[in-house]
């Protein structure tokens, strides 16, 4: 059903984030992330390059939608804890107060997610999400773009993948070939660039050129978006978690909490 609905849109779709909007995501593109991605890979394996490109691009937008929606709900519910500072308590009363804050936040998240389309779809597993975090789809997009005779996007996809996998020999060879093409340099860009990154680079260039006013201005403009991106990445660590083992109540809570903390310590803001 969703393949039929999407057919007309895919024929004219641009790059994966052109016209992307968190608040007004096209209904015709809404589908399970895993379904879109697996179908794109199926078309890749049968060498149906235009169809593969279209669905791989849609899967990238769906992943961003899921990530942005998760961050939106967690930011909105970040204060849904204890209503006032509780007096010191011991034993069961302290435990109940702690759990009350957890339950209030859980209720807030549940209500938030119920009203957003990203969570009305079947949710992807952790392994698939990590594949997107590693920018693995760009490995397939690069070759599909190339076979579809779209060299500018193939070059950009190869560069975007190499930023996360600088030692990948196959992609290094592909990039070496692309760089031998006239005017290839203008297409070497990171398709996952955050808005603050361009401002920061511009600020550094102004700094190196002793243009202090411009450097200060651009750096000040970059900082708010950097901290927003940082907060969004941290919020993503508190997203859905697959429960594979049956454990005691406290062991389960402890494992989940440690997993979230490890994610926050180790996360990469460039993903």
Swiss-Prot record:
Pfam family, one: TPR_leprecan
Disulfide bridges in this chain: none
Residues spanning the signal sequence: 1-15
Positions annotated as glycosylated: 76
An example Gene Ontology CC term for this record: endoplasmic reticulum
Coiled coil: none
Gene Ontology biological process: chaperone-mediated protein folding; collagen fibril organization; negative regulation of collagen fibril organization
Domain of life, per lineage: Eukaryota
Tissue specificity: Found in articular chondrocytes. Expressed in a variety of tissues.
Main localization of the protein described in the UniProt heading: secreted
Cellular compartment(s): Secreted, Extracellular space, Extracellular matrix
Keywords: Extracellular matrix, Glycoprotein, Secreted, Signal
Sequence similarity: Belongs to the leprecan family.
Function summary: Necessary for efficient 3-hydroxylation of fibrillar collagen prolyl residues.
Name this protein carries in UniProt: Cartilage-associated protein
Species classification: Eukaryota, Metazoa, Chordata, Craniata, Vertebrata
């Amino acid at each position: 059903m969703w393949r039929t609905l999407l057919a007309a849109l895919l024929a004219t779709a641009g790059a994966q984030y052109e016209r992307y909007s968190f608040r007004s995501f096209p209904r015709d593109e809404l589908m399970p992330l895993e379904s879109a991605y697996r179908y794109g890979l199926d078309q890749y394996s049968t060498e149906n390059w235009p169809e593969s490109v279209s669905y791989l691009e849609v899967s990238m937008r769906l992943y961003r939608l899921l990530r942005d929606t998760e961050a939106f709900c967690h930011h909105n519910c970040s204060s849904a804890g204890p209503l006032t500072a509780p007096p010191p308590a011991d034993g069961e009363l302290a435990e109940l107060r702690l759990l009350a804050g957890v339950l209030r936040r859980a209720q807030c998240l549940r209500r938030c997610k119920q009203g957003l389309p990203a969570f009305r779809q079947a949710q992807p597993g952790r392994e698939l999400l990590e594949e997107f975090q590693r920018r693995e789809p760009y490995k397939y997009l690069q070759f599909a773009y190339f076979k579809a005779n779209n060299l500018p996007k193939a070059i950009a996809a190869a560069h975007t993948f190499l930023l996360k996998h600088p030692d990948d020999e196959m992609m290094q060879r592909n990039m070496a070939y692309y760089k031998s093409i006239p005017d290839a340099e203008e297409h070497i860009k990171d398709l996952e660039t955050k808005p603050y990154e361009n401002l920061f680079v511009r600020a550094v260039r102004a700094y190196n050129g002793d243009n202090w006013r411009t450097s200060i201005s651009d750096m000040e403009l970059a900082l708010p978006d950097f901290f927003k991106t940082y907060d969004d990445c941290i919020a993503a660590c508190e997203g859905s978690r697959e429960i594979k083992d049956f454990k005691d109540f406290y062991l389960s809570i402890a494992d989940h909490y440690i997993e979230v903390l490890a994610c926050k310590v180790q996360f990469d803001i460039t993903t």
